[in-house]
């Protein structure tokens, strides 16, 4: 990183020119975004500056905090010092700010839509594995109660959570009860047992079978019906609502069936195509969901950041349209 391997080439060449010319102007670099968002990646950006700048001791840095709500054009990071000391790092700190702010903002929005219900962060399979650690931390700061991989949970010393998956059920020849029994038998009791119940497209029937077999050991069931299917319990009720996928009527059917047989303790988790809008619809209708598993929608959108030199040797020197903007919320980084 310090040598510029991951940096846009023109930053590498800019530093090379300054070093060869022995020209070390003290600049003020101002970083901002253009959207209302919840900030992420600041801790990483600071770590990059501390570990990869040529001389951290020559820099003065001010920043907001991960999780802070930010306005368009608000300065989130301010760097002062010899430009050659950190010139090649711009690509890197802007990249982590953009990535983690996107994940954190999307997660915060679904968390707010779901309140007081819980949100589980489940998009690991939708992107490269190398982004998991920081993404998980951004989601954690944004309010997700759990993540699906140990890597995502590593920055705060936790571990991934999950359910009995479709693949394990298939490995036991489609027997959801048997797969769940094996989970209960072979996994620690400290691990909450949550089972996917849509393998046979009969969420009510499967939920009841699993609940009867496992009793208090069953923490919850997860409904993940595909958008192209109509669950068996919904077919007789069709006509006045969208019947496909995970819909309010299906969730109510499962909740009512479990309650009738005394399984009020069993939680219901829903997943599959959930967005801010769909969660809001569920909450407005009072759908008896206990938690939402949200995946690919948490990687959508653009939350880009821009860095500009706005002062040189303490005097205004930015390109047209860019000027120093003070932000009293910034705090000095030690």
Question: What feature does the model see in each segment?
Answer:
Residues 1-84, 92:
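Flexible, solvent-exposed loop/hinge segments and secondary-structure transition points
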Residues 1-13, 21-23, 34, 38-40, ...:
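Gly/Ser/Thr/Ala-enriched C-terminal appendages of enzymes
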Residues 25-27, 217, 305:
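A generic structural signal for well-ordered coil/turn residues at beta-strand boundaries
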Residues 30-31, 127, 299:
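Alpha-helical scaffold domains
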Residues 35, 68-70, 77-261, 276-277:
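Buried, small/hydrophobic-residue-enriched core segments of structured protein domains
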Residues 58, 116-119, 190, 265, ...:
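A generic structural signal for alpha->beta connector loops
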Residues 64, 198, 269-271:
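Structural motif
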């Amino acid at each position: 990183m310090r040598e510029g391997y991951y940096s846009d080439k023109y930053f590498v060449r800019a530093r090379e020119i300054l070093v060869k010319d022995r020209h070390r102007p003290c600049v003020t670099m101002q970083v901002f975004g253009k959207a209302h968002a919840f900030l992420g990646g600041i801790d990483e950006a600071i770590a990059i500056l501390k570990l990869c700048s040529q001389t951290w001791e020559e820099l003065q840095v001010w920043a907001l905090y991960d999780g802070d709500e930010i306005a368009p054009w608000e300065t989130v990071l301010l760097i002062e010092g010899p430009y050659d000391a950190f010139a090649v790092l711009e690509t890197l700190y802007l990249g982590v700010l953009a990535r983690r702010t996107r994940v954190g903002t999307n997660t915060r929005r679904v968390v707010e839509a779901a309140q007081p219900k819980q949100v589980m962060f489940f998009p690991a399979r939708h992107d490269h594995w190398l982004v998991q650690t920081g993404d998980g931390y951004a989601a954690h700061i944004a309010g997700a109660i759990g993540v699906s991989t140990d890597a995502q949970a590593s920055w705060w010393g936790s571990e991934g959570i999950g359910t009995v998956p479709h693949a394990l059920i298939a490995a036991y020849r489609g027997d959801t009860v048997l797969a769940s029994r094996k989970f209960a038998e072979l996994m620690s009791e400290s691990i909450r047992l949550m089972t996917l119940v849509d393998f046979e497209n009969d969420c009510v029937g499967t939920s009841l079978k699993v609940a009867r077999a496992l009793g208090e050991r069953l923490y919850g069931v997860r409904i993940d019906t595909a958008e192209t299917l109509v669950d068996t319990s919904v077919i007789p009720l069709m006509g006045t609502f969208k019947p496909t996928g995970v819909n309010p009527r299906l969730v109510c059917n499962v909740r009512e069936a479990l309650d009738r047989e005394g399984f009020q303790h069993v939680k219901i988790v829903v997943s599959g195509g959930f967005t801010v809008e769909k969660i809001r619809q569920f909450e407005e209708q009072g759908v008896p969901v206990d938690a939402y598993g949200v995946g690919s929608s948490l990687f959508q959108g653009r939350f880009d950041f821009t860095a500009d030199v706005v002062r040189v040797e303490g005097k205004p020197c930015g390109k047209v349209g860019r000027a120093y903007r003070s932000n009293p919320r910034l705090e000095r980084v030690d």
